[in-house]
């Protein structure tokens, strides 16, 4: 396969960064807890471990069911620009599930990051990995570029304030037969998206969750607030089950946006 010069340059840069710097955390270091952060019955799919995040990819929908990562204050301070990085098929997946960038062409939907590029500016490898199409869902442009982006920015502020936050997000499918897009690979269009945010600062643990419809309307963050318990009922997942019960029960019942501000 012929690769563009830009692609080759990025690979060379990536190799250099990995070889010469210790800033990129290994998968084992980064994801010691993330692989078990979501419990419950999983659909037919594949667990994917990337630099910076872990996800579970749904083979039938060709979107992630969930994506989880820890965002630290140091990582928020990363300065790597997203310019020059391209959406790529994930070769860890079976060929039939390797969504291509052109599958979104003309669909009217944005390629919406679940783990956002703005959270992965701390290394070339983490930025590269977040552009795999296994980390992407079809999002209405107004949601992706406005309400959802505002929430992503808020999460970065919270990580800076509290030292680190754990984030889990993913699509919600309410219809039995969702809309599909894709020229070669069929990609299911979500009805909405959830995001769970938790700070585990000792003695000050707190949590909050959000749900946004995949629509063009402006959706204020305050109106999108949910408890983690509500999102668990919606997704049928159990988040943070390895926490002590008293802490888990307390943070999963919280819905005070002001506690994070």
Please tell me what each predicted stretch does.
Residues 1-30:
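Bacterial Sec-dependent N-terminal signal peptides
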Residues 23-261:
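Domain-level detector for secreted/extracellular nuclease and nuclease-toxin modules, and
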